[in-house]
Amino acid sequence: MDLPGKPGSCWVANAPATSYPRFEQSDRADVAVVGGGIVGLTTAYLLMTAGCTVTLLEALKVGQQVTGRSTAKITSQHALIYADLIERLGLERARLYAEANHGGAEFIAGCVRNLDIECEFERKDAYAYADRSQSRNAIEAEAEAARKLGFAADVVDAAPLPFRTQGALRFTSQAQFNPMQYLVALARAISEGGGKIFENTRVDDVSRQRGGRRWQVKAARSYVTAERVVIATNIPMWGPIHFDVRLRPRCHTAMAFRTDSRSVVDGIFIGVDEPSHSIRMGRDAEGPLLIVLGESFITGHDGDVARRFRDLETWVRDNFSVREVAWRWVNEDYDSPDRVPYAGELSGKGSGMYVGTGFNGWGISNGTAAAMLIADQIQGLNNPWRALYKPTRRAPKDFNRGGDSQSIVDAIGRIAPNEGGVIEHRRRKLAVWKDESGTPRALSASCTHLGCTVTWNNADRTWDCPCHGSMFTCDGKVIHGPAVKPLEPARLP
């Protein structure tokens, strides 16, 4: 499926490349960190500066997965959330959420300043805007809730956008940045401070050392042995709690458009009505970009993701003056049932294991706050957000109901070149894809996490699990967990 723009994130394209070695020789550390996004790197940085020995293992390249594909808004304004949190959790817990995200945002600003990081950091006002007049009351209620929590929130009659809106909630002095440039600099600070970072190192298992209290983190034939382990992998794959039923995977399409102006919009924006769009300016090496995210959808539940890109491009061209599409990508995140992340130490059999997950699309501030909490817990320090983010709190068992493959076809002949589909052969489902020449190749269609049948993503040419959000390349390699093993090869019928 031909789509405009280069596949990939503009943030990754406009950041220095990293070249940390592969982990090949066993090691010991105070803390092992699995995952090199904003949670893992922030945790490692905090612990390194506190005097801990830290080893961080990243399956691919640091920062390039979820964080490097976000809209990178540094804000405690998360659309319409505070009125809902006050109603469901009470004023004090809502206040803790507000304080945690404000704290995370200010920590980033402090790192940019203190480490002299060049990452396109800019202060911007944040707007949650309404397309429909019926949503004005919800915006007013959210502003009132935000003010109860200490935010200087106000309501404006129209968002500063080139299309009509029905009012907007405004938080002043929020921020935006290039998350990849920030994380590359954070990784450099960790490495220069004595921390160890390894890339292209997929962890196979995390378990207690036999007969001991230390943890063993296994990658290929080597181990990191550590007193504490932090699982910062978007969704935890190991530990006594099954987060795959406590979290729901969701994706967004994103497109970056070339524009003749650096200020097509001034601010960071998110719509409160469906279909919602997230809007901000950015840039790459060739100049300014307008970056827009489309509406969310559950991973693996759409058999035509390419259509979502076409619809998003149409919406942007209808509402903005832009040129060609420069970049396009899909990002994945996980939602929690109460809109609050899970972060901190797992109790009981998980003692000494820490997680950060379920950021509900707001991982820049929430992920940083989670890292601050985890680092405090490891150091034995009190943290006021501990009870709010508690990863062992109760959750409904049916929050994530999973789904079925959206790519079932009745014959290989129905699969076009550069496309994929799932066929059934001798009671076994096969994931079949064709290269440009039309040559077919086959894999097992069973996700290696729990066996759900995968869906072909015709935009990214990936196999996506509709149950728990694992993603695989067209030839079966793991991109996102919770799966840790590739799709099994299979013979064509």
Question: Which residues are covered by each model-predicted region?
Answer:
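Flavin-dependent oxidoreductases
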Residues: 205-282, 413, 422
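C-terminal catalytic lobe of FAD-dependent flavoproteins
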Residues: 273-274, 298-303, 307-399, 443
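Rieske [2Fe-2S] iron-sulfur-binding domain
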Residues: 255, 424-493
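Glycine-rich FAD pyrophosphate-binding loop
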Residues: 49-69
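Flavin (FAD/FMN) cofactor-binding and adjacent substrate-gating region
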Residues: 2-14, 80-86, 109-185
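Helical element adjacent to the flavin cofactor pocket in flavoenzyme catalytic cores
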Residues: 137, 144-147, 169-227
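Extreme N-terminal leader/targeting segments of oxidoreductases
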Residues: 1-31, 49, 477, 487-490
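N-terminal Rossmann-like FAD-binding beta1-loop-alpha1 element of flavoenzymes
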Residues: 29-56
